[in-house]
């Protein structure tokens, strides 16, 4: 009895190995495509000796947990600001302006975090500066556009309401 069970288990194991080998070749063929890097490799330089400690940057309240907390508070504040005008039924221009400003701040800090994370200042300092200035210019431009839209047109929440019913 044990020999029959053992031979059937061995047959299952051999079948599984053959299946893995056949599928493995297809997966390996799929994953062996060439990979292109977006940035050239960084220069190989060593500052100091191996026994020197790593420089710790000075603490700043605009980085770390303070920055993360501010982002989360703004994101959480968008929830009631988005729902309140439609739930209450009143279109208050002050609340509309606060909603537009909060969306603008949330977008600016979010895109700023993307730039900080994916455009390293040590590796590409000029590109980092260009992206940061571009973000600042876009934020000012969108802020002016939202101000103009709020003061001379129907406003953000009324526009959303009209588009929703269209």
Curated annotation (Swiss-Prot):
<dbReference type="Pfam" id="PF05328">
    <property type="entry name" value="CybS"/>
</dbReference>
<feature type="transmembrane region" description="Helical">
    <location>
        <begin position="66"/>
        <end position="87"/>
    </location>
</feature>
<dbReference type="GO" id="GO:0048039">
    <property type="term" value="F:ubiquinone binding"/>
</dbReference>
<comment type="function">
    <text>Membrane-anchoring subunit of succinate dehydrogenase (SDH) that is involved in complex II of the mitochondrial electron transport chain and is responsible for transferring electrons from succinate to ubiquinone (coenzyme Q).</text>
</comment>
<keyword id="KW-0349">Heme</keyword>
<feature type="binding site" description="axial binding residue">
    <location>
        <position position="106"/>
    </location>
    <ligand>
        <name>heme</name>
    </ligand>
</feature>
<dbReference type="GO" id="GO:0005743">
    <property type="term" value="C:mitochondrial inner membrane"/>
</dbReference>
<feature type="transmembrane region" description="Helical">
    <location>
        <begin position="125"/>
        <end position="149"/>
    </location>
</feature>
<keyword id="KW-0999">Mitochondrion inner membrane</keyword>
<comment type="pathway">
    <text>Carbohydrate metabolism; tricarboxylic acid cycle.</text>
</comment>
<keyword id="KW-0813">Transport</keyword>
<dbReference type="GO" id="GO:0020037">
    <property type="term" value="F:heme binding"/>
</dbReference>
<feature type="topological domain" description="Mitochondrial matrix">
    <location>
        <begin position="116"/>
        <end position="124"/>
    </location>
</feature>
<keyword id="KW-0496">Mitochondrion</keyword>
<dbReference type="GO" id="GO:0045273">
    <property type="term" value="C:respiratory chain complex II (succinate dehydrogenase)"/>
</dbReference>
<keyword id="KW-0249">Electron transport</keyword>
<keyword id="KW-1133">Transmembrane helix</keyword>
<keyword id="KW-0472">Membrane</keyword>
<keyword id="KW-0812">Transmembrane</keyword>
<comment type="subunit">
    <text>Forms part of complex II containing four subunits: a flavoprotein (FP), an iron-sulfur protein (IP) and a cytochrome b composed of a large and a small subunit.</text>
</comment>
<dbReference type="GO" id="GO:0006121">
    <property type="term" value="P:mitochondrial electron transport, succinate to ubiquinone"/>
</dbReference>
<feature type="topological domain" description="Mitochondrial intermembrane">
    <location>
        <begin position="88"/>
        <end position="94"/>
    </location>
</feature>
<comment type="similarity">
    <text>Belongs to the CybS family.</text>
</comment>
<keyword id="KW-0479">Metal-binding</keyword>
<dbReference type="GO" id="GO:0006099">
    <property type="term" value="P:tricarboxylic acid cycle"/>
</dbReference>
<feature type="topological domain" description="Mitochondrial matrix">
    <location>
        <begin position="1"/>
        <end position="65"/>
    </location>
</feature>
<feature type="topological domain" description="Mitochondrial intermembrane">
    <location>
        <begin position="150"/>
        <end position="166"/>
    </location>
</feature>
<keyword id="KW-0408">Iron</keyword>
<keyword id="KW-0816">Tricarboxylic acid cycle</keyword>
<keyword id="KW-0809">Transit peptide</keyword>
<feature type="binding site">
    <location>
        <position position="118"/>
    </location>
    <ligand>
        <name>a ubiquinone</name>
    </ligand>
</feature>
<dbReference type="GO" id="GO:0046872">
    <property type="term" value="F:metal ion binding"/>
</dbReference>
<dbReference type="InterPro" id="IPR007992">
    <property type="entry name" value="CybS"/>
</dbReference>
<dbReference type="InterPro" id="IPR034804">
    <property type="entry name" value="SQR/QFR_C/D"/>
</dbReference>
<feature type="transmembrane region" description="Helical">
    <location>
        <begin position="95"/>
        <end position="115"/>
    </location>
</feature>
<protein>
    <recommendedName>
        <fullName>Succinate dehydrogenase [ubiquinone] cytochrome b small subunit, mitochondrial</fullName>
    </recommendedName>
</protein>
